[in-house]
Amino acid sequence: MPGQGFDMNELMRQAQQMQTQMAQAQEQLAHETVEASAGGGLVTVKATGTGEITEIKIDPKAIDPDDPEMLEDVVLAAVNEALRSAQNLAQSKLGGLAGGLGLPGL
């Protein structure tokens, strides 16, 4: 409608630009690494910004044949922390892109 300032072509251009920026940000995230550790550094986990676990290091001191549950808990804690870090990284990279269209709720 004339006079309301709504330009569908401009909206489509912005959407395409945002899609390109999103793809670039996701590509960057795939190449960025976060690291987390648990158990005082006995277990260290690395993950990409997209949440793919790329490495788990376990200090031999963490391996107690009489208490495998302790190692399981420490590995789980380190993995969860690495995934949280990856999510935070992704949010910081991608979070501002949705607002680019100026639409409420995005």
Can you say where each PLM-predicted feature lies in the sequence?
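A short interface-forming secondary-structure element
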Residues: 56-68
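Short, well-ordered alpha-helical segments
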Residues: 67, 72-86
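Residue-level signature of catalytic and energy-coupling elements of molecular machines
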Residues: 15, 51, 75
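Long amphipathic alpha-helical segments used for membrane anchoring, targeting, substrate engagement
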Residues: 1-35, 82-106
